């Protein structure tokens, strides 16, 4: 019998969240971001739920080949571009669009022997200082690309560092707008946070530059890009991944007794504890402290003690106080939607561990069985 733990990918939630992104940017086309194996969900598992997107944006050629193998004939964008010259041949063969963010990538294009000109997205470093040409060098890079016969069309791209924070996008937007004001080509600027928070209606003072394409990532997987200011529910998003496990043992813990490695939890009254078949080897964060929320049979309660490699412990007091029956075999929702419909947002689990929902999704371990359901 398999170990009682399972992740479920919700196709209907993916469809819903993609539609929610479109609602926020009705005049833009939508890149569905499926990098990092679709944020840990699995590209093949999310494809049906996201196939209404206008394009798929991802990181490397392997992911691009997987999307093409699923039958997708629309646009695919390599967000970091190519890493070596021979990658350009596969870009031609698979009809991929790719980002250009450095002189070396322009050099590769210039030396690439092809009869098929390629579409590129020229990246500006508008303030994040990660990838892209500085504003001072951006137009020179555009001019150089525009002179290459290997290049068909140049689109313009940047990435916001603080779309989810107090600093916002005003400064970066102004820099991008000034440098690109008379350059042709489609623009793509907005990630999940910018798409949801910084629409013309919500932020009229931002010096808004419309995106021809928006790039929702975390939002299409049902996590709030600006948690805890807003929850996923506030944004009308639904969890695309649920992680459940079952109680495999129970213990009565007396006053003064401890639970788990390091005795980090000591009971101040007698409690019943459930031992759950999930640990950090499954992708649940070891740093989640006592008090991290969980759902047991759809009733909200808390973890107690330190998370082990294969197990964690939960306080069953709230469940029994609510009149619920609980014991070995009871279902525990670590994040996502419980059988009774109650949702535990992945962000609520990530925050006590000092991380973000993105990391929990990406950290789902290969040993966890995954079911795709509508």
From Swiss-Prot:
Residue numbers bearing the N6-(pyridoxal phosphate)lysine modification: 35
Active site positions: 35, 261
MF-aspect GO terms: alanine racemase activity; pyridoxal phosphate binding
Pfam families listed in its UniProt record: Ala_racemase_C, Ala_racemase_N
Origin: domain of life: Bacteria
Key word Isomerase present: yes
InterPro entries, per database record: Ala_racemase, Ala_racemase/Decarboxylase_C, Ala_racemase_C, Ala_racemase_N, Ala_racemase_pyridoxalP-BS, PLP-binding_barrel
Cofactor: pyridoxal 5'-phosphate
Record EC number: 5.1.1.1
Enzyme kind, highest EC tier: isomerase
A biological process from GO: D-alanine biosynthetic process
Pathway the protein takes part in: Amino-acid biosynthesis; D-alanine biosynthesis; D-alanine from L-alanine: step 1/1
Family membership: Belongs to the alanine racemase family.
SUPFAM superfamilies, per the entry: Alanine racemase C-terminal domain-like (SSF50621), PLP-binding barrel (SSF51419)
Name used for this protein in its record: Alanine racemase
Catalytic activity: L-alanine = D-alanine
Function: Catalyzes the interconversion of L-alanine and D-alanine. May also act on other amino acids.
Binding site for substrate: 130, 309
UniProt entry keywords in alphabetical sequence: Isomerase, Pyridoxal phosphate
């Amino acid at each position: 019998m398999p170990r009682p733990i399972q992740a479920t990918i919700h196709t209907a939630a993916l469809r819903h969240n993609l539609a929610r992104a479109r609602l926020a940017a009705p005049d833009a086309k939508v890149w569905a971001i499926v990098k990092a194996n679709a944020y840990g969900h699995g590209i093949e598992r999310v494809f049906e739920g996201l196939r209404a997107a206008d394009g798929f944006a991802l990181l490397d050629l392997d992911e691009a080949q997987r999307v093409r193998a699923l039958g997708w004939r629309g646009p695919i964008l390599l967000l970091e571009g190519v890493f070596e010259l021979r990658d350009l041949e596969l870009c031609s063969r698979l009809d991929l669009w790719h980002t250009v963010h450095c002189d070396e990538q322009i050099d590769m294009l210039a030396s690439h022997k092809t009869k098929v000109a390629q579409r590129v997205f020229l990246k500006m470093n508008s303030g994040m200082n990660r990838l892209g040409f500085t504003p001072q060098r951006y137009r020179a890079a555009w001019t150089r690309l525009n002179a290459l016969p290997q290049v068909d069309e140049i689109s313009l791209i940047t990435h916001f560092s603080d779309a989810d924070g107090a600093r916002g996008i005003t400064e970066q937007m102004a820099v991008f707008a000034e440098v690109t004001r008379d350059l042709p080509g489609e623009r793509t600027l907005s990630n999940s946070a910018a798409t949801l928070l910084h629409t013309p209606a919500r932020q009229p003072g931002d010096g808004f530059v419309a995106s021809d394409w928006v790039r929702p990532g975390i939002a299409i997987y049902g996590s709030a890009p600006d948690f805890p200011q807003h929850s996923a529910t506030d944004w009308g998003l639904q969890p695309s991944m649920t992680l459940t496990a079952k109680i495999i043992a129970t213990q009565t813990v007396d006053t003064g007794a401890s639970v788990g490695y390091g005795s980090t939890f000591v009971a101040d009254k007698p409690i019943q504890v459930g031992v759950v078949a999930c640990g950090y080897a499954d992708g649940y964060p070891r740093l989640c402290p006592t008090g991290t929320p969980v759902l047991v049979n759809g009733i909200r309660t808390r973890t107690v003690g330190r998370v082990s490699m294969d197990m964690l412990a939960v306080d069953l007091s709230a469940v029994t106080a609510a009149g619920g029956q609980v014991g070995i075999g009871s279902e525990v929702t670590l994040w996502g939607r419980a059988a009774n419909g109650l949702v535990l947002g992945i962000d609520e689990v990530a925050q006590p561990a000092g991380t973000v929902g993105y990391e929990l999704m990406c950290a789902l371990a290969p040993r966890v069985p995954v079911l795709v359901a509508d």
